[in-house]
């Protein structure tokens, strides 16, 4: 529900987006077993941030569901979550971490770029609310 609350005001990120995210989380749980990790950030017993990594192969990891509640933005929590995910991927032997995002999230894309992710491709694809750009970014790990 954190995704639903955080994105509800953005055009194209309504209930269908929340259902799409719920579906991808269910797939992660069912298919991933112990091949990844989830981070949750709480403040006063309330969820204020999250992210996850799925180890997709021996060398590639996928960054998933980076989200920080509006009340906690601008304080470095997003950076801390993504940096923890990058460390985990690197320590797990991955030489590459990648993510998929879409348009309408310039703050997220700026954070990813600051942390060394580079744009690989942007192509139109059928997503939760019709055709949108699916943006692929990746970071090579040392």
Task: Annotate each predicted stretch with a short phrase.
Residues 42, 66-73, 102:
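A short, internal acetyl-CoA/4′-phosphopantetheine-binding micro-motif in the GNAT/acyltransferase core
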Residues 82, 88-101:
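Conserved GNAT acetyl-CoA-binding A-motif
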Residues 4-28:
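Conserved GNAT-fold acetyl-CoA-binding loop/helix
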Residues 95-142:
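C-terminal "cap" of GNAT-fold acetyltransferases
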Residues 40, 46-55, 62-67:
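Conserved beta-strand in the GNAT
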